[in-house]
UniProtKB/Swiss-Prot annotation:
Protein name per the record: Long chronological lifespan protein 2
Keywords noted in UniProt: Signal
Top-rank taxon, per record: Eukaryota
InterPro entries: LCL2
PANTHER family: LONG CHRONOLOGICAL LIFESPAN PROTEIN 2
Length: 123
């Protein structure tokens, strides 16, 4: 009888420990729990308004033209780089301006070809 009681108590203790460990896992995975020391290591998100951008724009020094999208300093506006050059192609228009458009399919300069077709009214 004594062995059965000790076995039952040990089983309940083991079950309680496993349940607590399981909940701690979910708290960590989904950001719950409120453990202060874990939250101190997280980086803070940028503000949801334009204050971060405006602060960087105001502090940027450029003697020529400061590109509004990338804060790059270039000699003329159509030299501004695209914000996401890995997925965008830059296409210079004839009037001294430029646009950045999503890269086309598999062929080089496919996006530029589509812009030209659209300008001619063929697309």
């Amino acid at each position: 009888m004594f062995h059965i009681l000790i076995g039952a108590l040990l089983g309940l203790l083991f079950l309680a420990t496993e349940t607590r460990a399981q909940f701690q896992f979910f708290e960590q995975m989904f950001g719950g729990g409120g453990h202060q020391q874990q939250q101190d290591h997280r980086e803070q998100n940028v503000a949801s308004d334009s204050s971060w951008y405006q602060r960087n724009y105001d502090n940027a020094h450029c003697s020529d033209y400061l590109c509004p999208g990338t804060l790059a300093c270039v000699s003329v506006p159509h030299h501004c780089p695209c914000q996401h050059p890995d997925v965008e192609d830059k296409f210079e228009l004839g009037d001294g301006s430029a646009i950045c458009i999503s890269k086309g399919g598999f062929k080089a300069n496919e996006a530029a070809r589509k812009v030209e077709l659209a300008r001619k009214g063929l697309l």
